[in-house]
Design a protein with these regions (language model features):
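Sequence/structural signature of long amphipathic alpha-helices
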Residues: 1-163
Length: 163
């Protein structure tokens, strides 16, 4: 008996739950952004006059040489980060992000189970390769680099054989 189709159905259901959790986080965050901006501080304009911002103390330290100005910006940033964290907690964003992270880990764990389960049919190999590409490919920039390009081409070949 081939377990891959059942595992793949579970994987798809978990992936759908994860996508819904991401959308929920985005919705809460959009509401929060309607009330306040991301916690950041303005930096002096760049060489071309463009506006720059810092969202972390390291960036401030790298850009601002005056210790007094640097400390002031870092304190302002800390206050803004604290307000953001409090608002995120109050609106449920922090809890939603925790749920999303747990679902993401569960998706990857189930992908590992699926990928290590022996395939008994060509269709199961196609499903396994699809899961491998969807969970392990480094990103869209890798679509044209080896071995990801070749793995995608092999997946197309296998799908053709499976039909």
């Amino acid at each position: 008996m081939d377990l891959i189709p059942r595992l793949f159905a579970e994987f798809q259901a978990l992936l759908d739950r994860h996508e819904a959790a991401l959308a929920y986080c985005d919705c809460i965050e959009a509401t929060l952004l309607g009330q306040m901006d991301y916690p950041r501080v303005p930096l002096p304009p760049d060489w071309d006059g463009s506006h720059r911002y810092a969202g972390d103390a390291g960036t401030i330290a790298h850009v601002i040489s005056s210790s007094r100005h640097r400390r002031r910006l870092q304190r302002v940033l800390q206050r803004r980060q604290r307000r953001w964290a409090e608002a995120a907690q109050r609106t449920g964003l922090t809890a939603a992000q925790g749920q999303e992270a747990a679902l993401d880990a569960a998706v990857l764990d189930l992908a590992d189970v699926l990928l290590t389960t022996p395939a008994r049919t060509l269709d199961a190999v196609v499903l396994k390769l699809g899961v491998l590409l969807s969970t392990r490919e480094p990103g869209s920039h890798a679509e044209t680099t080896s071995p990801w390009r070749e793995l995608r081409l092999i997946l197309v070949d296998l799908r053709g054989l499976a039909d």
